[in-house]
Amino acid sequence: PQAFYKCSSLNGTISVPVGVFSIPSYTFAATSISSIEFNGAVTEIGVNAFMECSSLTSITLPDTVTTIAPGAFSNCIQLECFVFPENPQFTKISKETFKGCTKLEEVLIPSSVTEIAESAFQGCTNLKRVVLSNNLNTIGSMAFKDASLMEGVYIPASVSSIPENNQIFKGMANNSVIYLGSSDLISLMLQSKANPTSTSNGFDSEKTSLAVTDGGTFAADTKFESGKLATPIKEGSIFDGWYKNEGCTGTAVTTSTAGETYYAKWIELKSDAISMEYGSTQ
């Protein structure tokens, strides 16, 4: 551990050779490296392994990685792009993993992830877009606190609880939208009023609206924009607009207003059985 900790003269690209399976705690913390090449089958990134690497701009982890320990990439202030491993054994984004990564703009959580721990993305002040895993169950306290440019986040129906007093969404952008995979999540979002307009989980009705996708998700390239309702997708159905009531009656809308709740309308595709006899034109 701490092999190159605070070696500020260590810069450029670091190549991790074949045969290395773990990056121990603090190994490259507070160095000046700008990129990393993984040539082997690394499975674990240790505690604070790349913390405060102020020149590190992008990282693509190999699909062999199963564990990213707490604080691994915290305060990497130039980190703009991070690609998670596609590994069914990678199930948790640990505490403070990306805390203080002020240039990180978007996060696509892989389907294997079931838990995002506390403060995982806290203070990511340039984070604009987050798409959570459809298998996510747990979101820790302050996970996205002070992500002040975050214009949209999708919370899948698989999330079973949003604990009170955790300030998960505190500090989102004006006219931002929180997309909910199920209407069951509405009550969780509105629980425990901290004041007349905001709740203890950080949802502020003066700044943010809710949009229920009713099982719909979003394509990987979907852009969430303040004041605009993004278009969801749902297998076996066609999206038929956003509405201001759960019955999806009246006129569809495309823009959002803070404090409102919107509902997605779907038209189910039906494949009618067609039988034709040989030689028939009917």
Describe each PLM feature range.
Residues 1-5, 24-27, 46-49, 69-74, ...:
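Consensus positions within tandem repeat domains that build extended binding/scaffold surfaces
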Residues 3, 19, 26, 64, ...:
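Intrinsically disordered, low-complexity segments enriched in proline/serine/threonine
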Residues 7, 76, 124, 147, ...:
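Small disulfide-bonded, cysteine-rich extracellular recognition modules and tandem repeats
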Residues 8-22, 31-44, 54-67, 77-92, ...:
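Structural signature of tandem-repeat unit edges
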Residues 52, 75, 100, 123, ...:
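Sterically constrained small-residue positions within well-ordered secondary structures
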Residues 83, 180-182, 198-282:
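Secondary-structure capping and domain/repeat boundary segments
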Residues 165-168, 188-204:
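Short, aromatic/basic amphipathic alpha-helical patches
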